[in-house]
Amino acid sequence: MSIRHCVAVDLGASSGRVMLASYQPGPRALTLREIHRFTNSLQKVDGFDCWDVDSLEGEIRRGLEKVCEQGILIDSIGIDTWGVDYVLLDKQGQRVGLPISYRDDRTQGLLRHAEAQLGRAEIYRRSGIQFLPFNTLYQLRALVEQQPELVSQAAHALLIPDYFSFRLTGNLNWEYTNATTTQLVNINSDSWDETLLNWTGAPLAWFGKPTHPGNVIGHWICPQGNRIPVVAVASHDTASAVIASPLADRHAAYLSSGTWSLMGFESLTPYTCDAALQANITNEGGAEGRYRVLKNIMGLWLLQRVLKEQNVSDLQGLIARTAALPACRFIIDCNDDRFINPASMSAEIQAACRDAGQPVPESDAELARCIFDSLALLYARVLNELAALRGHPFSQLHIVGGGCQNTLLNQLCADACGIVVVAGPIEASTLGNIGIQLMTLDELANVDEFRQVVRGNAALTTFTPNPDSEIARFVAQFQPQQTKELCA
């Protein structure tokens, strides 16, 4: 059997990669190779925080061309990115307006406005999605209110991965897993909810019916003239990461750890009860009709900002210095919206500790210790919420994504949660992207079969909880009322 070559374009909030996967069907050997890496950052344009999508497109094309230059025949391409953000196109397929980021503050106050007009429970009943102030629901309302001239110019609204697929193929697509992050998809019909869309003021005609992962959107013509299928993978990066999570059984939870931390479990049915609403649980779409019942946690965004502000280049050295410090001296609520995009993350963390009457972290190691301890405690709280929601404790927690390389945080998580943690794979989003491509190419039957491939090829590390650790002893004192729901 011939080797399959699939390319995953994986875009994150701070960087992007073009990765080549080679799959040998016989031994089920799967290898990944990074072909091209590039930075991604926000730019101020006309007062808005925007993505440089032209630069990103150029980097994507350069990465694909690098693969072709090596004489490799690509079987398929897939693109995954972050959620909620969109690009407007006119009837000719030209971009309209700016590709504004979810971290821009233009949606301030609109979540409360929606709750007042539609009702919080009604919005949740329709969408099943967590209330976040930057959801596309509120972004579109901000667009209509603040830039009404763009509404008549636009003919289509594409989420970020669908936009880049369009740029490669010329074909429009609205992929389901990412569409659900908008808070605009009806959880019962898997189509756009007209009541919610009407509230935004955006035309329903901007959107086509969401399609589930696994369809071929179109073809990219490589410089050598080959027509390469572009597959609609699970284009929300977390959806792809969950596909690649080697969950042991239905009682295993996952934590996709990166800029954001997404903690949850898979379910064949959504959870939209009052308890789920009160806990601000989200029911995002997954592959094969599964729901990703999860909660957004601010994640390593706080650390990324601190590293930049403190000019730290040696992360492993910082982690070693952090591990030597006592635990739980500085505790913040990582899900406080004050940490979404402050002018200085270091100063904001210090201010939060000062406001709480705690000692104030001064050094880079103390700031990191504050972040790690606070995240681990929040992970424990969320895991308990999820277990209570489903009425059954979890057997394991699988940490996947780039954050799973942080061994200190992995152990703190195991200790705080009192559960065995299995870390890996690191490249979860990329692997999940590749998994859907291999299923589309009929090399694998389903997600469960792909997870067997992941288990057979990925390096996994187990962390056993230590009930005598400082953070484990502190957990009993950790008061839930000290935290509030992220942007709820």
Curated annotation (Swiss-Prot):
It is an enzyme of class 2 (transferase). Gene3D superfamilies: 3.30.420.40. Keywords: ATP-binding, Disulfide bond, Kinase, Nucleotide-binding, Rhamnose metabolism, Transferase. GO terms for cellular component: cytosol. Disulfide bonds join C68-C222, C353-C370, C413-C417. One of its GO terms (biological process) is glycerol metabolic process. The keyword Kinase applies. Substrate binds at G83, H236, D237, T238, N296. ATP binds at A13, S14, S15, G16, R17, T259, Q304, G402. Its cofactor is Mg(2+). Pathway: Carbohydrate degradation; L-rhamnose degradation; glycerone phosphate from L-rhamnose: step 2/3. It comes from the Bacteria. It catalyses: L-rhamnulose + ATP = L-rhamnulose 1-phosphate + ADP + H(+). It holds the Pfam family FGGY_C. InterPro entries: ATPase_NBD, FGGY_C, FGGY_N, Rhamnulokinase. GO terms for molecular function: ATP binding; glycerol kinase activity; rhamnulokinase activity. The active site is at D237 (proton acceptor). Involved in the catabolism of L-rhamnose (6-deoxy-L-mannose). Catalyzes the transfer of the gamma-phosphate group from ATP to the 1-hydroxyl group of L-rhamnulose to yield L-rhamnulose 1-phosphate. HAMAP family: Rhamnulokinase. Belongs to the rhamnulokinase family. This is Rhamnulokinase. It comes from Klebsiella pneumoniae subsp. pneumoniae (strain ATCC 700721 / MGH 78578).
